[in-house]
Amino acid sequence: MSDPRYQIDVSVETRYLPEQSQPEQNRYVFAYSVTIRNNGLLPAQLLSRHWLITDGDGHVQEVRGPGVIGTQPLLGPGQSHNYDSSTLLATQVGTMQGSYQMVAEDGHAFDAPIRPFRLAVPGALH
């Protein structure tokens, strides 16, 4: 069972961006909207991110970096942070997953997992 002081929940919504994609060149652009919510008992700050982006052929791109969209949000208990971003795949379907590296007010460092989610061109999955 996880410690109730350190509970960060992540939800993601995705959409295909046909206007930015070039299927004839195997370029499929997907937007994703992320909500990071602190359901723990202590304030916690997001320090960095780690993503694994896998295309339909199994090729994995690993992304690490500080913060999200240039910020390192501090979330009090019950607070959330939302941001939008995008990614490029060479296939019509893929997945993303990863984690946010957090530090709580008491100095405890922990990872907030981002469960795998699907990226798919509408109609690409049957």
From Swiss-Prot:
UniProt superkingdom: Bacteria
Residue ranges occupied by any ApaG domain in the UniProt entry: 2-126
InterPro entries noted in UniProt: ApaG_domain, ApaG_sf, Uncharacterised_ApaG
GO biological process: error-free translesion synthesis
Name the UniProt record assigns to this protein: Protein ApaG
Species of origin: Azotobacter vinelandii (strain DJ / ATCC BAA-1303)
Taxonomic lineage: Bacteria, Pseudomonadati, Pseudomonadota, Gammaproteobacteria, Pseudomonadales
